């Protein structure tokens, strides 16, 4: 059994309680305008190229079977349309200008890496988080991985956008200790405008997961011009007040730090000029949501 992944991040402290290791899966059913991990959207392999890091060594030209790299008078030319995603160029790149997103990892390989820091999990109350992309697009792998981790006493957290069939969640529920659940907008039409899909399934899945009794942390990416108006914030607070097992709501500030990622992948940055919300705006939203009986905090303070 293998998974398509983009990264494994150790000593993650914002992906659940304690010190954690986060496995990032590739592929997502949504396409959020503000996505800060654009390399995780597509299910296909993608090669990232950062021209400012290229030293012109030509090692990539020598190993590329598709002739997707050229070194000429104008420097390094990457012909993306010719790239086959084999990753050979990344292996020999001396300047770290090339990075392949979308590699295979076996269940045993992932488990062994994730267990390397078990002592830190135990001393900090941490564990393992799976994120993405959307990990539930590879639910069978997550189920098998979480089962092994639970059998060895490791806390498991699932970071999800909610836009998958509930039957996929049913596979992992027995082995999941915590959900990190995204809520992007309460209005379905505006939700679809922002991420490409309506929100009915997401809201329905949240209510079902709440009934399992598993801890849920809600994450609201707070994006000026998208979901920062009072009507939307109150709508989210009112909806969340139905849930009984939400540990807290984190109002996460939008940031534009992913601009270089979009450029390196030759992807359109669909929200490039929006400023990050102020501390005052984050606190205001958290206070409104808290007024509905759900603990909410600013993502900058937690």
Where are these regions (language model features)?
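N-terminal-biased segments
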Residues: 15-17, 24-25, 41-42, 46-47, ...
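Auxiliary Fe-S-binding modules of radical SAM enzymes
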Residues: 2-17, 211, 224-302
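Conserved dinucleotide-binding and phosphotransfer motif residues
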Residues: 67, 96, 151-152, 212, ...
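N-terminal pre-triad scaffold of radical SAM enzymes
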Residues: 5-59, 76-85
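Conserved AdoMet/S-adenosylmethionine-binding subsite of the radical SAM
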Residues: 108-264
């Amino acid at each position: 059994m293998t998974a398509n992944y983009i990264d494994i991040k150790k000593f993650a402290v914002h992906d659940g309680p304690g010190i954690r290791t986060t496995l990032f899966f590739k592929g997502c059913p949504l396409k959020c305008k503000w996505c800060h991990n654009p390399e995780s959207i597509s299910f296909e392999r993608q090669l990232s190229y950062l021209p400012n890091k290229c030293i012109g060594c030509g090692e990539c030209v020598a190993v590329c079977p598709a002739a997707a790299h050229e070194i000429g008078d104008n420097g390094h030319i990457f012909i993306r349309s010719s790239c086959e995603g084999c990753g050979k160029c990344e292996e020999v790149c001396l300047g770290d200008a090339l990075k392949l997103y979308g590699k295979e990892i076996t269940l045993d390989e992932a488990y062994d890496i994730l267990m390397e820091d078990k002592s830190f999990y135990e001393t900090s109350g941490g564990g393992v988080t799976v994120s993405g992309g959307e990990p539930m697009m590879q639910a069978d792998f997550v189920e098998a991985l979480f089962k092994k981790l639970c059998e060895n006493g490791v806390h498991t957290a699932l970071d999800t956008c909610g836009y998958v069939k509930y039957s996929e969640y049913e596979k992992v529920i027995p082995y999941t200790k915590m959900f990190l659940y995204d809520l992007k907008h309460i209005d379905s039409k505006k939700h679809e405008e922002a991420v490409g899909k309506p929100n009915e399934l997401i809201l329905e899945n949240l209510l079902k997961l709440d009934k399992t009794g598993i801890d849920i942390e809600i994450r609201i990416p707070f994006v000026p011009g998208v979901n920062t108006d009072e009507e939307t914030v109150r709508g989210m607070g009112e909806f969340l007040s139905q849930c009984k097992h939400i540990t807290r709501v984190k109002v996460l500030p939008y940031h534009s730090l992913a601009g270089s990622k979009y450029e390196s992948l030759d992807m359109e940055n669909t929200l490039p000029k929006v400023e990050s919300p102020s501390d005052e705006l984050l606190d205001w939203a958290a206070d409104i949501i808290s007024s509905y009986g759900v603990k909410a905090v600013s993502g900058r303070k937690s």
